[in-house]
Amino acid sequence: MAPVSLPPGFRFHPTDEELITYYLKRKINGQEIELEIIPEVDLYKCEPWDLPGKSLIPSKDQEWFFFSPRDRKYPNGSRTNRATKGGYWKATGKDRRVSWRDRAIGTKKTLVYYRGRAPHGIRTGWVMHEYRLDESECEPSAFGMQDAYALCRVFKKIVIEAKPRDQHQQQHQPYVHTSSNISGSSSFDVCSDLEISSNTPYNTAAHIQPRFGNANAISDHDDWSQYLSQNMPTSFSDYGSPYGPYLTQSKVNTEVQCEMFQHQMSLPPLRVENSQAQTSDFSKRLHQNSGQSGFDDFTFAASNSNQFYNSNVDDHLIHIGNLDEQSYIEEQELILPSFQSNDQDLELYGGSRTNTIDNIEIDDFFSFENQAQDNDNSNVTPNSAGFEMIGEEIIVNHKMLISTRQTTEILYYQVVPSQILKIHINPVHGNEERTMLMEEDSDDSWFQKAENVAKMKLKQISLVAKRYYKCLTIIF
């Protein structure tokens, strides 16, 4: 049959109902079709890319229609053989019912072509809709022939593969280094009418790099200390740490830590052992106002000391390592107020004093060490006579930094009322009961003996009587 040419503007786009009620029903019942535009081709003996050349309608819509006879896989079976030379058609999804005027007229099955042999076939973009006629639509003359032909719509779906996205990396921040790797790929594959499969891995890695430095790194600390500057006591504004902040992952965590510092009643103390400075009245007054002992909240361990106070409670530790490589030798100046009227002299480096005091404790100290000076040789000489300046050479070897947060331990006690056990002892009453029981037992024993003797006599008499009666019956 020669290809049919349609006038310009005409397209062959029948619906599912039209394909079954008109074309397939007339083909099975042997009725005439006005325009023979659907050829009869054995689809399971041809490859799908050869089918466009067998179509009678030249179409640019990438859609072709064919009548295909049914090829049984087994002679006595009902399964259809859908294997070709280069691959096979595999059914996907469930069979859908096609209705017309609220009446089932047929079924629609979706199949996908795979290259190779099952189960290792490669999926392609060729799709086929197989229409079959319902048994109720067959005429009596064609009864049982509803499976003789199937009307197939063959088309090819275009597989769309999206390009992978570019990898984006965020800029390095002073304390937090964040890098993200985003790559995605999506593919538009064929299954039924529309199938989309995507694979979008998302991997985000965050690296936190703390910064340590000398006294010149105070400016880097301003980014973190600005969150602590608000709602803090003004007497501690001069203290600071030359090093970077703790291991914080974001500014949100920093703000949470700031809130924790603000709600505490006292700030962490600092203990300096083996110091030759005198404990002043000012430090004692601060110790009384704190209302807590020295190592309640924070503990700073210098040199090789790894002991910290009250380790039996739940502590949250923050450890900063890699501090063994850096050692600082600095000259610190301790300015201690003295309210004594007799002490009015100021001593600089190299001075001598007669008073030697040990074990100074400075409470309510915000940072874990004094703020480093920009110039080692710069000395500040106060004009007031109430201050004393003591020059010390302190060698600090930073080993470990431990921050602890203690929680209260609640103990519950249960008071159980005492129980009283009363015991009554009456030996006289017990002896009377024993004597009464013995008398009753003695009476019962004599009566029982008499009763037993009477029973024995009666048994003997009954035995003699039975023997006598037996003898009489034998004689007579």
Swiss-Prot record:
Keywords: DNA-binding, Nucleus, Transcription, Transcription regulation. One of its GO terms (biological process) is sieve element differentiation. It is found in: Nucleus. The lineage of its organism: Eukaryota, Viridiplantae, Streptophyta, Embryophyta, Tracheophyta. The gene is NAC086. It comes from Arabidopsis thaliana. Expressed in a few sieve element cells before enucleation and in phloem-pole pericycle cells. Residues 105-163 bind DNA. This is NAC domain-containing protein 86. GO terms for molecular function: DNA binding; DNA-binding transcription factor activity.
